[in-house]
């Protein structure tokens, strides 16, 4: 059937076609101006959805590659640089220690070495204050706190060191009195004229050297005993609990006079039952304790069970020791009581003497059989001197057992290591109450020797990929570094002062001004100084010979740490290369998906424009034609 086509229909159709052409022209113009295939999701939903996914992935890659990996690289480079500097300092110090070990040092050599050691002693730790974007790089999660104190300060810190018996060493103490200060003005006074070579001697003493020197000291020993404590922890055989003597052998705890058995099943009334068997073969002593009760075994030994289930066996014999076992008592509905024990026991050792300075008397207090049970605290040098019996007791511990020392330090110098990065610490600031200090590293007290997880900082540098960027202070900056250098400095200074005093007395003798009693006094003093300087030189050489190996260990550790950082840098570089490749690939995918082809667009737009112009010409004819033109 034929259809009638009117002029109006022709005009409308022509206008619609022209509008379609114009719409296409607008679309191509927008694509050409924006260089994108679409300007709104409705233009092409497939392209839009794909664009969202590709751009999301690309944004993540940009974050990993341009930000995270660059930050990680900066952190690692700064860490490596600091370790490199530290290693160089350690090698230089090792060289000076080797010189001291050789013994052939002139006065000028000694002065130069003393000056250099003094400089290095402060510099060794200051390199550990390196920062990355304001964050301290060696202090774990405490990136807002420097590794060392940046200025002198006075503030009380209560520090608990958790060590093992490898920290017990033996040092040689030389008794020279005040001979180093002899001069022309005082050699004949009563304080100096009595010096002879027979008063000069040296002997070895065992000690635990603490992390710091110049510790707090009170004139009242009761105050010192309240703040300065020494104890050790050891494994316990808990089924049943056995105690066998005055030391810990790794599996059981011993008292001097008894073997002790504690029945976890308790007596008929649910109380803890104890059996003390004397080691002299006497009849066993069996008894039960209620919570809060104390039983005296003999004049020296007693046992207490407190309300919290803590069992304390105290012995005042040889050497003094208090052994504490933590147990938990539980009573069921039937009234039966059982006890559960911790697998570690704490034994306290009494510190017998306290000295403010490293005097001859302080070292003599632990020397010899008469002082075999003594423990002496020296605040100036930060040492616990051990009598022979105490040394043997602690030496018998397993390497896995913990020796715990608590002490206070209030006077801090620039470049002292901040203890909050190493130990359980209570900090008593001006703004805190005396019974409410700031507490750091509390979790260390719950772990043998304070072995808690390192505070590792990692950066995300890829999908499900991260890299460790930080190195913790304990991996390279140990307290022993500075303490060892300080000891060499002190020994060298003592030797140097005795050499100078010897030269002074020798020049007085050679001056010809003195005769008779004064000359005899000078000759005796010269003999004493000669023996003293020989002993001091021998002690210095012996100590430095041992430190050569120790400092080799320090440099090796620094090298290993630097190698570890370098390996992480190498891994990061590989990841960065991969991220760079991924970034390029995804940028191309995004471009292919979103970006328009300019050449193709130009051709299409030119074609559309020609079509549009032609359409305008034809439509103009249609629009001016009416029905009358056909009549």
Language-model segments: which ranges?
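Polar, low-complexity export/assembly segments characteristic of proteins
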Residues: 18, 25, 29-32, 36, ...
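Signature of Asx- and small-polar-rich beta-strand/turn repeats characteristic
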Residues: 279, 293-294, 299, 307, ...
């Amino acid at each position: 059937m034929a259809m009638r086509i009117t002029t109006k229909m022709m005009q409308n159709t022509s206008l619609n076609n022209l509008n379609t052409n114009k719409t296409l022209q607008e679309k191509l113009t927008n694509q050409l101006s924006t260089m994108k295939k679409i300007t709104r999701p409705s233009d092409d939903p497939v392209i839009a959805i794909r664009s969202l996914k590709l751009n999301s992935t690309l944004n993540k890659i940009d974050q990993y590659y341009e930000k995270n990996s660059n930050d990680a690289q900066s952190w690692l480079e700064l860490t490596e640089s600091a370790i490199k500097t530290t290693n160089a300092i350690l090698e230089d110090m090792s060289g000076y220690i080797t010189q001291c070990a050789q013994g052939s040092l002139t006065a000028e050599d000694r002065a130069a070495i003393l000056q250099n050691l003094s400089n290095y002693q402060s510099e060794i730790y200051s390199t550990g204050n390196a920062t990355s974007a304001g964050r301290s790089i060696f202090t774990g999660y405490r990136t807002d706190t420097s590794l060392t104190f940046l200025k002198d300060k006075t503030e009380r810190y209560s520090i608990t060191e958790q060590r093992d018996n490898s920290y017990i060493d033996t040092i040689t103490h030389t008794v020279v009195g005040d001979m180093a200060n002899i001069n022309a003005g005082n050699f004949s006074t009563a304080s100096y004229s009595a010096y002879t070579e027979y008063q000069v001697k040296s002997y070895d003493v065992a000690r635990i050297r603490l992390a710091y020197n110049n510790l707090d000291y009170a004139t009242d020993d009761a105050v010192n005993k309240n703040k300065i404590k020494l104890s050790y922890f050891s494994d316990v055989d808990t089924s049943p609990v056995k105690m066998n003597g005055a030391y810990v052998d790794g599996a059981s705890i011993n008292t001097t006079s008894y073997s002790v058995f504690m029945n976890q099943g308790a007596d008929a009334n649910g109380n803890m039952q104890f059996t003390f068997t004397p080691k002299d073969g006497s009849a066993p002593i069996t008894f039960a304790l209620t919570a809060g009760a104390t039983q005296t075994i003999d004049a020296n030994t007693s046992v207490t069970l407190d309300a919290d289930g803590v069992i304390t066996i105290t012995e005042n014999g040889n050497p003094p020791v208090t052994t504490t076992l933590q147990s938990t008592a539980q009573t069921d509905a039937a009234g039966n009581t059982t006890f559960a024990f911790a697998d570690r026991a704490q034994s306290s050792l009494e510190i017998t003497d306290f000295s403010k300075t490293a005097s001859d008397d302080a070292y003599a207090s632990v020397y010899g059989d008469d002082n075999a049970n003594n423990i002496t605290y020296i605040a100036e040098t930060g040492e616990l001197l051990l009598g022979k019996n105490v040394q043997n007791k602690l030496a018998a511990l397993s390497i896995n057992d913990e020796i715990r020392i608590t002490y206070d330090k209030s006077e801090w110098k620039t470049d002292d290591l901040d203890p909050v990065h190493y130990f359980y610490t209570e900090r008593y600031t001006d703004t805190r109450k005396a019974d409410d200090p700031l507490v750091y590293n509390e979790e260390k007290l719950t772990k043998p020797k304070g072995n808690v997880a390192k505070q590792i900082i990692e950066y995300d540098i890829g999908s499900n990929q991260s890299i460790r960027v930080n190195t913790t202070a304990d991996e390279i900056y140990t307290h022993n570094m500075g303490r060892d250098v300080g000891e060499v400095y002190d020994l060298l200074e003592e030797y140097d002062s005795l050499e100078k005093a010897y030269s002074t007395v020798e020049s007085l003798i050679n001056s010809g001004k003195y005769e008779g009693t004064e000359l005899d006094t000078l000759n005796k003093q010269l003999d004493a100084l000669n023996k003293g300087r020989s002993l001091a030189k021998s002690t210095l050489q012996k100590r430095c010979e041992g430190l050569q190996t120790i400092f080799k260990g320090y440099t090796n550790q620094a090298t290993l740490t630097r190698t570890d950082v370098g390996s992480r840098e190498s891994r990061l570089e590989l990841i960065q290369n991969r991220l760079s490749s991924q970034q390029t690939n995804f940028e191309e995918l995004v471009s292919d998906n979103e970006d328009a082809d300019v050449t193709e667009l130009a051709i299409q737009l030119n074609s559309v424009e020609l079509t549009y112009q032609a359409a305008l010409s034809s439509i103009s004819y249609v629009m001016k034609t009416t029905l009358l033109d056909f009549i």
